[in-house]
Every structure is written in C-alpha cells, then in structure tokens.
Amino acid sequence: MIENWPKKPEGSQWTDDQWKAVVANGRDILVAAAAGSGKTAVLVERIIKKIINEENPVDVDRLLVVTFTNAAAQEMKNRIGEALEKVLIDEPGSQHVRKQLSLLNKASISTIHSFCLQVIRGYYYMLDVDPRFRIANQTENELLKEEVLDDILEEEYGIEDNTIFFELVDRYTSDRSDDDLQRMILALHTESRAHPNPEKWLDKLVEAYDVEGKTIEDLVYASYLLEDVKFQLETAEQHIRKATELAMLPDGPAPRVETLQADVALLGTLSSAARESWTSVYEAMQNVSWQTLKRIKKSDYNEDVVKQVDSLRNKAKDEVKKLQEELFSRKPESFLRDFQDMHPVLEKLVQLVKVFTERFQAMKRDKGMVDFTDLEHFCLQILSEQSENGEMNPSAVAFQYRNKFTEVLVDEYQDTNFVQESIIKFVTKDSESEGNLFMVGDVKQSIYRFRLAEPGLFLGKYKRFTQEGLGGGMKIDLAKNFRSRHEVLAGTNFIFKQIMGEEVGEIDYDADAELKLGATYPEGEDVAAELLCIQQTEEEVIDGEEGAEVEKAQLEARLMAQRIKAMVDSGYEVYDRKTDSMRPVQYRDFVILLRSMPWAPQIMEELKLQGIPVYADLATGYFEATEVNIMMNVFRVIDNPMQDIPLAAVLRSPIVGLNDEDLATLRAHGKKGSFYEVMSSFLKGAPLEEEQELHEKLEWFYNLLQGWREFARQQSLSDLIWKVYGETGYYDFVGGLPAGKQRQANLRVLYDRARQYEATSFRGLFRFLRFIERILERGDDMGTARALGEQEDVVRIMTIHKSKGLEFPVVFVAGLGRRFNTQDLMKRFLLHKDFGFGSQFIDPRKRIKYTTLSQLAIKRKMKMELIAEEMRVLYVALTRAKEKLILIGTVKDANKEMEKWLDAREHSEWLLPDHIRAGASCYLDWIAPSLYRHRDSEMLLELGQGSIPDEIYGYDTNWKVEVVDGNTLLAPEPVQEEKQELLEALREKKAVPLQSERKEEVYDRLMWKYGYEDATSYRAKQSVTEIKRNYQSEEGSDNAFIKKLRTPIKTRPRFMEKKGLTYAERGTAVHAVMQHVDLKKPITVEVLQEQIAGMVNKELLTFEQAEEIAIEKVISFFDSDLGKRVLAAKSVEREVPFTMMLAAEEAYQDWQGKSEETILVQGVIDCMIEEEDGITLIDFKTDTIEGKFPGGFEQAKPILEDRYKVQLSLYAKALEKSLQHPVKEKCLYFFDGNHVVNIEE
C-alpha cells in the first residue's frame, strides 16, 4: 500500500514522479511517460527493485514483461542483466542475485506474440493444432488466402438459385472482375480478427442493418452525425459572428449587421433542433431561408473589409448547404429503407467471411502453420472460456498464470490492440484497485492505428485512474524530458497547446501533458527552432500536380542541403554527453524526417550533388536493380522460354552479350514464332561466316538453359540459383562493376529469399515467380540490400515512424506542406471497429447509387481519427530533436495560405477553434497558425500583437519564421566577375587570348608535385598484425606483395564457398570464448558449455564456430601456471583496443620518406593482468605446432619468438604509453600443446 512505499534515497537522480513509478504498488498503475522521460530506465529499475527487495524478493521468472519489439525485449534483458551484475559486485555472496542471473534467459520478457507462442507451446493439446507448427510468411499467407477465396467463390457461382449471392455480386463487382468483392471479404476477415470475438463482431455488424421497428433516432450513425451537425453549425455561427465584428468596425459595412444578426438567429434555431433529434433538424433544414444582404455603396466603406464580411457569410452558408445536401435532402425514413434493403446482402457477405475464415484456418492447420493473429487468438482461446451468455471468462490455465506472475508489466501500452488487452486481462488480477498490472506508454506517441493499435484503451484508463489511486487504478505522469534543449521543448509545447484537444485530437494537451525540461545543456548559439515556408515559383505551379510534387521535394532538398553544409562548414557546435563538452557538428548528427518515403530518392540525389554523404533505408528499388532484374528474367525463361521479353532481356544482358544488331539478325531467321523457337531453329542450321560468333554465344546459352530447366525439375530452387550464379559467372561479373559489393549483396538477398520461400508450403520455380509477383502487387518491394553501417558519418533520411524511440542533435522535419493521405476515406466500402460496415447504396436494376448514413458516419469518424493520428505523428517528429529543430514545408501560394492561417490570430483561447484544427489538410495548417500568434513571427507579418493574449504572444519560446522564395533555390550559382569575359567569349565562339593572368597559375597546377610522394607508397594506418608481417622476410618481399594483388578482391557468398571454418575463423572463435569466460565461476566443462550456448544465442558465435571450440584446451589454459595467475590477478582486462602514433621507420624496414613521419597503429591486446609486482601481457595463439615441426616445440620456439616478437613489443609499448607503467612480462600462449613462450627484448 501507499504508506509502505520506500522513500527516495537522498541524492537520488530519480525525480519524485520517476521514483513513484519505480516503487508504487498494490493496484493497477498507468505511467504516462512523455518523450525522453526515461521510461525504459524506470521500468528496469522497477524490475530490479522487485527482484532484490529485502523483505519480499521476487524471482525474475515470476514477472511478465511485454515489449513492443524483439529488440526492445533483448535490450530490457541486457539492462536487467547489467544491473544485476552491478549488484553482484557489491554483494558477491548473494545466491539470490546469482539465481536471478541464471533465470534471466528463461524469464518472460518478450513481445506479446512471443508470450502467446510460449502459452501455445505449453498447452497446444487444448487446440486443434500441430505442436510442430511454424509461423507463416506474409506473402505465403496472402497466396493461401487467394486460393481459399477463389475456391469459395467458384462454389457460390455454381449454386443454382443463389439469389442473394448474385445480388451481392451485382452490387459490389464490376463487369470485368469480382476483385472488389474479394477485397471486401478479406478486409472484413482482417478487421474481425482485431477483436477478441471475431464472430460476435461480425454478427453485430449485420444486426446494425436490421432496423425493423426502429426510427432513425435509434441508429448509432444518426447520433454520431448529429454531433457533427452541431460542430458544423457552430463553425458557421463563428463565421457569422466574426463577420458581424468586422461590419461594426468604423469603416465596416454597418448596414449589413442587421442581416448578419438574423443569420445568427437562424443558425441558433438549427443548433437547437440538432440538440433535440434528427427529425427536428430535418424539418428545420427544410425551412432555411437566408435574408438578402442590404445593398450598400461600396465606396463608402473599406473595400477589403466588405470582401471579408461577404466571404465569411458565404462560408457559413456553404457549411449549411453542405449539410442540407449530404444529410437532409432525404426524408429520415428513406435512410431506414436503405438499411433494410442492404440487410440480407450484408448478411450473405458476412456468411462468406465466416466460411472463408473457417476454410483458411483449416488450410493453415493442414499445412502446420499459423500467422501472428492466430498466435493471439489461440492464446486467448487457451486463457478463456465462454459462459452461457457468451461472455469470455478466465480459464483454469489463466488462473495458473495469474498465480505464477507477481506482476505484469507492459511497455508501449498505447500500441496495444483489443485482443492483446484481453490476453493481458486474463493473466492479471480482476480488480484495478488491487491489481498487479503496470503499464507504461505515451498516448501522444500512439502512431500505429494502421496496425490496429487502439489508443482508446490507454485514454480510457488515463481518464479513469487518479493520481492518488483511490478506489481504482493509479496514474503517474512522467513529464520531464531528459533529451532536449529548452528551445525544442518550449517550441513543441507552444504548438501542441494550440492544436491538440479532446474533441479534435482525442487528447487534452494540458499542464500534465506538457513537456518539462529535465536535461542540462551548455549555452548554445543559434538553437532557436525554425519554420521555413518555401513559396513555389509560378513556373513550378503551372507544371501540374505531379510536377509540382517533384519540385517541392527538390526545393526542400536544396534548402536542407544548404543549411547542412553551412552548419558543418561553419563548425556549428552540439553537445557531446560522453565528453561533457561542445564539439563541431558531424553529418551523423543530422536526420531528415518524412511522413513517408516517396521524396527520399530526390532528397538523397540533391544532397549527394552538394557533396553531403546521405543514407536512407528505402523499401523500394530491389527488384528494379539491374542485376536482380536480369536474374529474375533468367528464371522466367527457365520456367517458360516462350516468353519473348524476358528472353530478349537475357540475350541482351552481359550473360549472353548480344547487341541490337544480333537480335535483329536472329529475328530475321524467323519472323513468326517466339524468340525461343527462332533461336532453336537458328541453332539447328549451319551459320554463315559472319554469324559464327552469334551462333557460338547462342549455343552456349541454349545448352546451359536446357541443363537449368532439367535441374529445376529435380532440385531445389536455391540450388538452381547457386548453379546459375556459378555457371554464368554473373555474380563475379557484377562484383567488378561500380557499387559491386552492393550488387553482390542484392544477389545474395535473392538467394536468401528463395530459401525463405522453400521454407513455406509452396514449391517450384513457377510458384516462386508468382510469389515475387504477389510481393510487387502488394507494393512490398524489399529495398536494395543494406551496405552501410549504423555508425557511418552520413545524414540519415527516415520516416517519422522509423524514428520513434530515436534521438538526433539536429532534426529537419520536411514535407510539412504535403496533404494528409485520405485515400482510405475514398474507398467504395469503409470499416470501423465501432460502426461496422458502410458503403454506398447501389441498385443495379435502377442503375443508381448514393451515399448512406453508415458510410457518412464512418467516413466522418475515420477522418477525425486520422486527424488525431497525424497530430501524434507530428508530436513524435518534433520530440526527436535534442538541440535544433528545423521545420520545412512548401506551398503554392504563400500569400493565400497566410491569409487563411491568420484567422487564428483572432482567437484569444490557447486551443485554436475546432474548425481550424479539424479542417487542416497538412501539418503546416497546424504549425503556421500556431506560430503566427507568437511574437517571433512579427518580423514576417508586421501586424503587431492585436487581440492575442500576452501569455500566447509572449510565450517563452524562440522561433525563426521565414518565407523562402523558391526562385532563390533554383537559381544557378552566380558567375565570378573575372570569369564573365571568358564565358561570353566562349558563348560567341570567339578566340580566347593565349596570354592570360591565369596562365602561370594553370601551369603551376599542372606541374605540381606532391611534397610527400615517398610516403604514398606506404599506408598511413597499419594494424599491428600488418607490421608484424612486414618484418617477416617472405611477407615483406615484392613477390609476396604481387601474390596479394593476385588474390581475388571480391569474395564469393558463403553458400558458394567450401564448407568448414578457416584457420582464421577458428582463431576468432577461440578468442571470443576467452574474452567472455566468466572468471568468477569455476572453469568446468559444464560452465563453458553453458557459456558457449549463451554466446550462440546472443549471436556472438555461430553454431559452426561453437562446434569447433575445444573446451578441454580452454580448461588446460586455466589449469596452467599462467592461467592460475590470470584467475588470481588483482585485475584482468581482455580484448583491449588501442591506437597510437609510431615513427614510420619503426613500422617499415624499407622506409624512404622523411624521418619525422609517423603512422597510426591499431591493435587489440588479448589479455593483460595486473599483479602485485606489475603488468603482464598475454597473447593467445591457435597456430598448429604438433606434427608441423619434426623437432617438436624446441624447434618451433625460436621461430615463434621471431614471428611474434615485433607484435608483442608494440603491444607493450602501447600499454606503457597509455598506463604510464612498465610492462614486466610479455607471454605467448599456444593452445596447441599448452605451451608458454616469454618474449624478451
């Protein structure tokens, strides 16, 4: 209970709210953790505190920790493990902590799907499922769905007198295909599976259309739409009231005030009717009559004010007219007839969905596979049982889990869906006031609605729970942000206090939701947040919508390139926490965030032109890559050589090497028939002399093709790909092209994709090609293989979704003028979790169709949910910045947009009016109106404070707001004055004078000689191993260098190499084991086997490497005198990296350069131990000794000493430089024979 919570220790770094989240218990707890508030650290600390609690310690395997991703789960385990190891240092004798470390790998810290899998594996016998099931591939799943659905529809078409089915087909299919019907069935199936009881949800959907005996007031759609009617009437009234204020100005059209007041009265009557019933509004709408505006002499009044008054009145009339046309042009009973007419058709549709679900589940069961939704529903099936009234109650298994788990902790709770919520509910206590559920998340960062995440679950508890936890659950707000500067936080708060509210946005951005400063930064220059609004040029706007989009991307890319280059070149400084100091910004400090990636290729191209290194993980382009395209055509030809286009592509490719003339020659031998038939015929005849080379190329390819076709019928697809790569030499060929490594990586991915395909229930080349086509149809192009590390010094481009959880010193958020994606609202049918199904009413006999009440309601609901989701996406984007936030958007007509945005200045409340926020079509429609109410926009607007309250106008935030002329970004670089004369002479094709001021400069540059030419023959950076080799006579000779040059640079992929580990790979594996041996545990076979298995799980070793480890040799080392010294040492450091400067003449025996030259030397010391009398350096060796030297180790010892003397001397020199302490002993340990060699100077 509350009074038993531990007090926060003195000097603790935890805030009061963080500490409360760490120690609070005794009820369900919801932690609303704002961006950068340290929620993961809090979660880990809470777990640790529970594990090491002195009075009531909890075993780690009695906690269920649910994370959003596998990576998050692994990070959580690692953090807990590190924290426990720190505890163990203070309490080395604690058996409880040691036990927790051993339990950690088996602990239930995982994604919800992994937990579901664990439950299913344990209780599979309660389900009709093969215990050896596998997880289905997404594309395989899609192909199976198609197969099942085709069979069902085929059966339905074959049934006589299937009247309702054919009615359904007539309404929802075109003359060409029934694709729309198939999409409806699949969409309803998918949506239903997002609910704990799919059949119940489908039945409710049908029940909603059974309106027998009901009035329109009984329909949920009408109730919801009435709220929207009130909203739109309120908007219209605000327009009229604003017009009235303007008309009453000294130079306003005062005679029109009387008419405007009558308008307000009319709108008031309509609003009153909307508060009563649908029928009341319908009747009131039939009597709407607007008075005619009084005529005035316009010259007597301010013309602009008159125009504004007229414009506002017209906007109000348009709002009412829209309502009349959409909702109240038909009698209420006609809407009811629509539902009644559609009811049997919808009933048939739902029946088909149920049949499909049943058949699809059966097919997956037969193939021994499940998908991710199956995992959730199977788990729920095990954990629940249905009562007589259809309610789901916890099963006996659920009670077992309730007894097992002391607490259930859920990370990223805002992204939970209904099914997952039910699973969690069944393994936790029933009562919130005495519950054991701990939830962490930030509903403002819930951006996965498209994955069926339900932020309403979080919001419901946040509203229901109290900060004291009295009578129910407790909520805790973590609002302090430890990531960002004040300027970023204040700028974000200023925008969201104005745009995010409960009616529009689903969340109140109140004092509890505001971001509060928790990080400390040194004073910085130019840290103000920025809004840069680019005005497109007239030429760009005229270019059409698609052309304008291209230009927008180019304009924004150029502006960002200029800013990045300027910041890097000027030495703009950012704070480095590791060194606790400011440092010059690097390219890796920048990120460009986009809502989606279509602009990314253009932005990358523009940045590259400016010499800026850039990377974007594009999910497209893989199948467009030339090498992949050619190989896919090869496989198409193997499958069916009668396809002319793929065959011609292969013949024209480097594999065969024909040119256009060769193809024309081949076609001339047979104008009819396929290319393959012509080629076969050509090869049967005797070629002309000039066709001999063509004949040889085609014969070579034809013979290979026949072999591949035969091979494809008998062997696996992956083996076929291997064979094609090898026999054509194409893999090696692309390796020699520009970006060869990338191209080879793409071909390896194709091989891997084939192996993945073969792990599915499908087989054969034809199905594989269909498999790939299905991927492309879905728009799931994979993106080219990754050939860049995370730590590369590049500017990154990513989606806002990908950036969630990350942070960057400088953030550009671009594309803010792009319209929101509302395509889902335009579909022929709409689905919603609460409102079910909505589509147009279609009468195929009368050939009419019109909007239905359900469609209007769902569309409106989805629009408001989309607006709320986009607000949360913007919040995520703005909170990624640590030090500098730059917002960029492009508009067609800045003056016109500014006029619209300036409406916001007339409002005195913090939260902008609903109609402004709900009417936004892009992010700029929220950002600009907000900033136009701040003093920092005055340099742009020059309008003064006006009626804006001081607390808004003078809010403590710094912004730079600027409109950028697109012409300045597209203008070419200005030509230097001194070059102008030469350029003009060249344009006019005149002779350029031979004598020039630049003649000597040009001559000097052409004849310039590098002052350190001797040094160019040597590397500026060497590893210790390379220096050692230079000192060995054979390695240092010219012949050895030539041998190295002859070694192939491009390596073959793993699957094309000989099996087995190389000596180097074996050595690497042994060194890895020696690095990770736990010196605190007894060195036994069992302990080492467990450790090696753990290294395999953590991907520190491969299975093959693990099998090669000779455990007895590792034990032999620790049994030796040297090994015992390691175990007894004061301190032991392993795998110690170092870098030092070394005189070049020490590294190179044949150095010819200047004596003062130095090079950079890098190396890694295997082991160093500190004993009472000094430091000993140990280097482990896996050289083969036994059987290689006839005289045994005595013969080998001087050779080995000579081989490794330089290496260990350099290691010792590096240690002595860094530690300022002499190395007393340098030892080589050889595992082969358990030999120790001491290296003397």
From Swiss-Prot:
Q: Which residues cross the membrane?
A: none
E.C. no:
3.1.-.-, 5.6.2.4
Instruction: Work out whether the entry's keyword set contains Iron.
Output: no
Q: Name one GO molecular function term.
A: 3'-5' exonuclease activity
Q: Which domain of life is it from?
A: Bacteria
Binding-site residues for ATP, renumbered to this chain: A33, A34, A35, G36, S37, G38, K39, T40
Tell me its cofactors. Mg(2+)
Q: Where is the UvrD-like helicase C-terminal domain?
A: 505-805
Q: Which UniProt keywords apply?
A: ATP-binding, DNA damage, DNA repair, DNA-binding, Exonuclease, Helicase, Hydrolase, Isomerase, Nuclease, Nucleotide-binding
| Record-linked Pfam families | PDDEXK_1, UvrD-helicase, UvrD_C
GTP-binding as a keyword of this entry, yes or no, is no
Provide the GO biological process annotations. Answer: double-strand break repair via homologous recombination
Q: Where is the UvrD-like helicase ATP-binding domain?
A: 12-485
Which reaction does this enzyme catalyse, per its entry? Couples ATP hydrolysis with the unwinding of duplex DNA by translocating in the 3'-5' direction; ATP + H2O = ADP + phosphate + H(+)
Gene Ontology cellular component annotations, sorted alphabetically: cytosol; DNA helicase complex
Give the signal peptide, or none. none
Q: CDD domains, from UniProt?
A: DEXQc_UvrD, SF1_C_UvrD
Subunit relationships: Heterodimer of AddA and AddB/RexB.
Functional summary from the UniProt entry: The heterodimer acts as both an ATP-dependent DNA helicase and an ATP-dependent, dual-direction single-stranded exonuclease. Recognizes the chi site generating a DNA molecule suitable for the initiation of homologous recombination. The AddA nuclease domain is required for chi fragment generation; this subunit has the helicase and 3' -> 5' nuclease activities.
Q: Which family does it belong to?
A: Belongs to the helicase family. AddA subfamily.
Name of the protein this chain belongs to: ATP-dependent helicase/nuclease subunit A
